Each structure stands twice: as C-alpha cells, then as structure tokens.
Amino acid sequence: PSDRVTVDRQAEGQQANRVTILLNKPLGIVSGQAEDGHAPAVSLIQPSNRWRDDNARFFFHPSQLRGLAPAGRLDIDSTGLLVLTQDGRVARQLIGEDAGMEKEYLVRVVWTGADNPAAATSAAATHAPLRPTLRAPSVATPLGLIDEGDPVTRDVQSVFPRERLARLRHGLSLDGQPLKPARVEWQNPEQLRFVLTEGKKRQIRRMCELVGLKVIGLKRVRIGRVMLGHLPVGQWRYLAPHERF
C-alpha cells in the first residue's frame, strides 16, 4: 500500500508540473508540425516572446517544450487563440470526441454573391483567391455602381440576405454531415461573430463560401471561458492555475 501512495504522489506531482500555454498565433505560422517552410507554433514559445503582463507564477524552462502540442488548430491564414499543452486532460477537454467546447471567432467577410458548392466536400476549395475585381474603396460604393460580379467589401450586412444568415446558423452540411447549430451574428457591417461547438477543417471558411461570402480575415477570440483578451500577436502566456476552460 505504501508503494502505491508513493507512485500516486509522483504521478500527481508530474501532472501538476505540466503546463498549458495560450498563444496569439500570427498569420503564416502552422499549428502543428512545420510544413512547406512554415514555422510551427511551438517555435514561438520562448522566453523572449512571453507576454510581459503574464502574472502566472511560472518560470519558463526548456522541459516545458517536451510533449507540448496544440489542442486544436488554427489555419495558417488565421490568427488568435491557440492552446498548447503538455496535459492530456486539457487536450481531451478541448478536442476529445465528446468535447463540445464553445469556440468564438471574429470573421471579416466580403459578399461575392456566388455560392461555392465545392466547399461542402473539399477544404481545399476555400484556398482559391478572390477575383481580381476585388476593390476596397475609400468610401462606401453606392450599390447601383457596383458591377455585376464585383465583390462587396463595405457594408456587407446590408446586402447579405437574412435567409442566408439563417443557413449559417443551422442548415449547412460539410463532408456529407449536417453541422451542429452555430451562433452567428453581425459584429459590425463587415464582420461576423461565430460561436461553434465543433471544428471541421476550415469550417467557417467553407460555411461562408456555401452562402456567397468570402472570408478575408479570421481570428479566434475565446475557447470555453478563456479569452484571448489583450494578448499581443506572436506572444504567449501560461494558463493560470485558477483558469478553467
């Protein structure tokens, strides 16, 4: 029995020493392993990149990089809150089969008016660039002056049909599977706020393309109860002991 107690205490100590890190991932950084010359997110976890306002009472040590892995992912062309952890319990909570953790995103869009049905079955379909006719005028362009086929870049909310907003909330399918209901609201005339409880590959970009929108900026700002807050792009902080997803 005494041997078991010793082992249990050692296990508890090892678990307590495992860190979870919150990173504001920049554009051009991949979440997992390095690929196509792009650096992985873990390469940013260095003392020089630690947020100076991080008040968690942890000291950085290279051993904290051992086994540190992303719990979920952000596309290379997305920014915002990315969780890296050594703790399997945290990983299961965030990306386990029955996780259902809320994730909140701010999504800047333009209205193309052209649905992209290929996005329903292929994440790669969202990589196609906008047509060269895309313009961002210094003042809002009167709708009557927009040529047919031109993307609308200003006051998208005013031209985006309400029934398509309803489809974003519920009614779309990806890869042959119906999506779970999502909370989708206009944050401002060019930006939507998405709250999802699932995470298919390039899900938001594909959802938008199915209803005639093109995503031109995507930032994750919340996972569960943990907010991105004022964490600067490219910097990181520790998840404090009192914080819970």
Predicted features along the sequence, with ranges:
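Basic, flexible Lys/Arg- and Gly-enriched helix-loop patches that mediate nucleic-acid binding at interfaces
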Residues: 1-245
